[in-house]
Amino acid sequence: MHDIEILRPDLPRGHFRFVLFDFDGTLSLIREGWPQVMIPMMVDVLRQTGTGEDEVTLRAQVEEFVMRLNGKQTIYQMMQLGEEVKKRGGQALDPLVYKHRYHDLLMARIEGRIEALAAGQATPEDWTVPGSHALLKNLQSRGLTLYLASGTDLPFVRREAELLGLTVYFGAHIYGALDDYQNFSKKMVIERLLEDNKLRGEELLGFGDGFVEIEEVRRAGGVAVAVASDEANRRGVHAWKRARLIRAGADIVIGDYRQQGPLVDYLLTDSPLAGKQSSHG
């Protein structure tokens, strides 16, 4: 697999003023493994409806909607879970109940990582996609304004970004899920960003590992870099993520930011891409 895969060779380059980043899986690895928490929890909930479906079928169905909604606020995945319970004749709980159950299970998995970062026993580099800090520093030094928008609840995003030494790059432009979920979406952040800054679509660059942000950046006329990060191994491209993100409309696919220098040069100038790459017409 190539380090930088160009899927739209004629993409508009050199005009970017603002860059939008997703958080989990795009910059932060603190929540690495979240699907292994969410999917079994949901399969368990659906099994309790008394459905006749086997484990493999249930898991495939849950995985499909969980990953399709990845990038939106977590509550949407829980709302879909409620719909799936009803479809099977079960009594659905409030989506917030499911969300809190999931969050408790996830925290049991990741609280050691957060504590290690807070105590200085782990470094930000241990829990970020390789090359994240270098990329953000490079973009900021070239005068671009950076935004962070996450489907994770805002207080957690702020805390985890701070622990990872990322707040300095985004300042006040850190957005996350709100209790009143209808008042936040990545689409809303993008629309406000374009409107407030009188931006044309080609002046927006986006980085993300979720279907939603890739789709929304492209819809706005921006350029979408899909970060198909292999979060567990921290190297290379995750083939399943790559396939999904290409379907979402990715312009470029990378696995991490080890090649951020040539990538940024390519995006911000009209020079050809240096180094290892592949192009698809």
Q: What is the predicted function of each stretch?
A:
Residues S150, G206-I252:
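Acidic, Mg2+-coordinating phosphoryl-transfer loop and its flanking beta/alpha structural elements
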Residues H2-A60:
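Active-site neighborhood of HAD-like aspartate-dependent phosphohydrolases
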Residues E64-S141, T145:
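A metal-dependent, Asp-based hydrolase signature
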Residues L96-V97, T167-N183:
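A short, structured active-site edge motif that brings together acidic residues
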Residues F184-V217:
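Conserved Lys-Pro-Asp/Glu-containing loop-to-beta segment of HAD-superfamily phosphomonoesterases
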Residues M1-F21, L58, E63, M67-N70, ...:
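Non-catalytic pre-domain segments flanking phosphatase-related domains
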Residues T26, M38, Q121-T128, S132-E162, ...:
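Substrate-recognition element of Asp-dependent hydrolases with the DxDx(T/V) motif
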Residues Y175, D251-Q259:
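Short acidic-hydrophobic, aromatic-tinged amphipathic segments that line or gate anion-handling sites
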